[in-house]
Amino acid sequence: MRLEDYWGIGPKTSELLTAELGVERAVEAIESADVRALVDAGLHRGRATRILRRANGEAGMGVLATGDTREVYDDLLTLAAGYALTEHAADRIRVLTPSLDRDAIEARLEEVVAARDAWRSLDDDARERVVGAFTAYDEAGGTDRAAVETAIALREVGLTGGTFDALSGLDDDALREAADALGNVRGSLGDDDVEVAPGADDELDRLRERLAAAEELADSAFDVLETVRDGSLRDFEALEAATVDHVATETGVDPATVRAAAPDDALDAADFVSATLRGLVDELSAAVDDREATVAADLRDRIGDAGGDVDRAVEVVSDVAVDLSLGRFAAEYDLVRPRLVEDGLAVRNARSPFVDDPVQPVSYAVGTHSLAGDAGVSNAESPPTGDRVSVLTGANSGGKTTLLETLCAVTLLASMGLPVPAEEAEVGSFDRIVFHRRHASFNAGVLESTLRSVVPPLVEEGRTLMLVDEFEAITEPGRAADLLNGLVDLTVDRGALGVYVTHLAEDLSPLPETARIDGIFAEGLTNDLELRVDYQPRFGTVGKSTPEFIVSRLVANATDRSVRGGFEHLAAAVGEEAVQRTLSDARWTPEDDRSADD
């Protein structure tokens, strides 16, 4: 396969990879999602990641139907990569893509859930040992020896189940013996150009020292000529002899070896000195290569039967690093395995992975699901089943956009074979996820670009999930309601699923039978005058923005008399009694204003 056949690789990139890696090695790096190899070859890490995502998951990338969906996808992988135990594991996590292969999704879920449970089973000391082992592995550059030592450390911790079962088949004694031999090489003994480390063989060390000395002299041949040239030298033969003696003394090489490297037909003294040094460098380079090959062969013989264990350790440690990294991520966020279904999206007590502060979990669903009948789910938290579309309404700062983002995150995580942030979830298979955040701009260009981004994916063949936020933000309210009605009807007609956020529920025409309206309600103010919201949507009910709570807070916090008077005027407009009820502990009268001013 040609390098330019891969997405994102043009002539210049192909030329770079060919020069640095060779075509065969470059193709291998792309097919194995080896970000490190591409970065070492000169590609920016972000670009290498994008190339590998397309190369290894082209079909799945089509699930990311909008820029906002792609942003959530990127944020999820960045979040997960933050728990990676090695740099290579982080790279492999970053190139995960949604999959349309149900068996592949189930297989990865099995591995990650097993890794999550394995990580949870470790005490703090064992976790520190695991992290320390992988840190040492990374610092050593992921060598074969580092992999062997990491495998031994993981076996001592006692990781079992799933991917870790491969560790149980390794021979500790054989690995320890192999580790000693592997300590004498840089890289892998399986490489054709293996480099034997200094200290592994005395003869090889001596040859390398002599080669280094000869190369240094060759770089300063003119200085050598000036050193050996002496007024007492009577002829050219004397200069040749002086050159051989000087080079032999400076390099530690036998004079006969230096003489053998000297030319027989030098044109002059300068030519003789430079040619002698070049020839000696060539001779010593060949000697170093021969000796290094001999030592490497001896080291391979020392490993002997343990070679298979070494190969397995290298492979297993890399896989375990990825699985356990994802397991750490799943454990940290208390992620659970979703049930994969054909159609529908339902979550019980779901949480946004992007919100740091503890928040109220919510239950929600569109499509057909079975969570409504589960034990432990209250009626208020039992989403109706069978509706194709929900229109979500309610309070400002009520978490509507966060709910859309959470549903998007749950669906994307499940599509990548990763557990999700909920107590329970059922996730269908979607060919496209259309997540569209609210945009503040109000002009025809934004409306047109928005419609271009959400309508084409909706009318394509296959299953589509629509998660669209506040259409009224991009056009006048009356027309926005008409557009939203059209989108809801189109979603139902196309057999898609959708959640649409709006403040225009009362302006909508009657919805299709398989669409419903849900609402989020503000319930008052806290003692600190913060808005108190019940983030759990109430199904089949239009939510309330309750502006009196916002006005109440503004009245209570106003310190300027005239500004406060303005807010009081608004309070009368929205209902003074309602505002006063929310400020039962506040007495906002002109006398209070004068006291505050004093």
What residue spans do the PLM features occupy?
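Conserved amphipathic alpha-helical "coupling/scaffold" segments
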Residues: M1-T227
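Generic structural signal for well-ordered, non-transmembrane alpha-helical segments
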Residues: D205-D219, D282, A286, D311, ...
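Coiled-coil heptad-register positions
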Residues: E215, D219-F236, E240, S285, ...
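Extended, charged coiled-coil "arm/hinge" scaffolds of SMC/Rad50-like chromosome-maintenance ATPases
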Residues: T251-V322
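Charged, amphipathic alpha-helical linker segments immediately N-terminal to NTP-binding catalytic cores
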Residues: G308-V359
